């Protein structure tokens, strides 16, 4: 494996009931351009994401150290692989969860994509792996902020990500979880 780990190193975290889901995503551009649908900047809270996008485009990424967003052009039949926050935690920042976003469609246009999110069991806690010295020198640690604390226990990280992605639903139906989340991660 590229990290100089045994091929089965991460198996223990996925054994039993790994947490995965697929998502069929259909974006619609309003005919008059007033109701813009896209996805704001975020990182995926899982381990890896595989994404197949149509030929419309609109996906952008901001690689580590970049000062601007770059287009991720569709390539026929190619999958986009996004590193998730749990892989960043496991590699102590050697591999970084890439921030990405989806721009709104042109008025009257549509965009379709299929995403597969692969993650450990909800109760799995990932410890940082021991990297070879050459890699370890390039591992700055996880890139967290007060608004996005990365948890080593996947279930905690998934809940944090869900609350972040669906703030209106969380505020309406799970306000108690928002209070707990803000209390445990230091953000407000």
How would you name each of these model-derived features?
Residues 1-188:
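C-terminal flanking tails of non-heme Fe-dependent oxygenases
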């Amino acid at each position: 494996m590229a990290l100089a780990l045994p091929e089965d190193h991460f198996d223990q975290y996925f054994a039993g009931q790994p947490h995965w889901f697929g998502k069929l995503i259909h974006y619609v551009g309003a005919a008059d351009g007033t109701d813009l649908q896209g996805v704001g900047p975020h990182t995926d809270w899982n381990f890896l994401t595989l994404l197949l996008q149509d030929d419309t485009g609109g996906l952008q990424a901001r690689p580590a150290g970049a000062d601007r967003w770059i287009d991720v052009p569709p390539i026929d039949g190619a999958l986009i692989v996004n590193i998730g926050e749990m892989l960043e935690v496991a590699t102590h920042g050697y591999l970084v969860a890439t921030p990405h976003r989806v721009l709104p469609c042109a008025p009257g246009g549509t965009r379709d994509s299929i995403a597969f999110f692969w993650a450990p069991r909800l109760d799995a806690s990932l410890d940082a792996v021991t990297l070879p010295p050459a890699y370890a020198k390039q591992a700055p640690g996880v890139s967290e902020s007060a608004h996005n604390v990365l948890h080593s226990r996947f279930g905690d990280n998934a809940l944090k990500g869900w609350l972040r992605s669906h703030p209106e639903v969380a505020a309406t139906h799970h306000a108690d979880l928002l209070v707990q989340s803000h209390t445990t991660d230091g953000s407000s």
